[in-house]
């Protein structure tokens, strides 16, 4: 079977951009979609993002660092001492004014790594590193040894 995979990532609450990307992928004949995390925030999109995502054949999804930020804010892991944490608390408060809790539960269930096999080729899908979905280890100016963490004996 011929596969056309559209890779979605870093939506960050931008409903307009997600609509445009999905439309473009559909016009190009995408047969499946892989979502690499960061669905919510800081943009204003909420339920409509998940409605769009449920309208496409999403066959792999991993949790991104902003997804974790939302969960950490909801779980009371942020305080009022750090301005960044205050901002995330306020953004999450706005988010939860209309976001269905079923979507929060879905995000909470997402793994950090998904393994896929397509036509005999093995993929390892992550938002960043297999055990860490945040940080700058993969920036181009950094030591390339960090890229080795993306490959294992189950990845081509």
PLM regions with names:
Residues 5, 33, 75, 86-87, ...:
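General secondary-structure edge motif
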Residues 1-56:
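N-terminal active-site segment of His-dependent metallophosphoesterases
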Residues 50, 56-116, 122-125, 137-154:
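Active-site neighborhood of divalent metal-dependent phosphoester bond hydrolases
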Residues 25-30, 118-119, 153-155:
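Glycine-rich phosphate-binding loop signature in dinucleotide/nucleotide-binding domains
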Residues 12-17, 41-44, 67-71, 132, ...:
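Active-site environment of divalent metal-dependent phosphoester hydrolases
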């Amino acid at each position: 079977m011929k596969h056309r995979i559209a890779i979605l990532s870093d939506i960050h609450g931008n409903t307009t951009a997600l609509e445009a990307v999905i439309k473009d992928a559909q016009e190009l004949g995408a047969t499946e979609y892989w979502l690499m995390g960061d669905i919510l925030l800081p943009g204003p999109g909420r339920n409509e993002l998940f409605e769009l995502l449920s309208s496409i054949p999403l066959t792999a999804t991993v949790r991104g660092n902003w997804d974790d930020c939302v969960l950490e804010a909801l779980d009371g892991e942020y305080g009022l001492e750090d301005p960044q944490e205050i901002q995330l608390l306020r953004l999450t408060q706005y988010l939860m004014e209309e976001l269905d809790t079923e979507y929060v539960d879905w995000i909470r269930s997402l793994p950090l790594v998904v393994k896929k096999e397509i036509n005999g080729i093995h993929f390892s899908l992550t938002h960043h590193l297999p055990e860490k979905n945040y940080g700058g280890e993969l920036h181009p100016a950094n030591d390339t040894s960090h890229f080795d963490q993306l490959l294992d004996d189950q990845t081509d």
